[in-house]
Amino acid sequence: MHYPDRLRKVYDFKTGKQGHSYTAVGNTFLVKYLERLQMRCHRNLTDEQIQAEVEHYIRLARGGVVLVSPFMSPAEEAIYEAAYKERLPMVHIVNRGLDGKFIYPSGRDLTGCTDGFMLVLAPYADYSPETAAARITRSQCLDMNGYAADIASIAQKEAET
């Protein structure tokens, strides 16, 4: 089932405890779910540890928890793949702006938005060939993880029990 209306951009979309402003595309109701969990995994996990993280977070998402993350580390990317395959609810925070008439999420993010199980949030307004090609900085990574923590309603430790 496709929901083309979910491709309508929402500018100045405020959410989270701090009320940060984003450009949003997708299912904006996902930030209203009672259980939203920041998904953050260390970059240097082994294959076995990554598989354990995938199983853990997918089990939570199957139970109705919305996964909130920039999906940057290899483990987070693996969780994104598994959640996408099962069409589980996700909020994807991206490091590029979505402002501009023809700037939209691409690939699977676009499909996830139109299918209703994904919300893409862009905390940065600008989008240009320069910013699109620029390598993400550590500061941006920390900021995006901070945005995910702000949107989450469940602390990481609570979800592990």
Where are the model-predicted features located?
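Glycine-biased, small-residue-rich flexible motifs in mid-sequence functional cores and linkers
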Residues: M1-T161
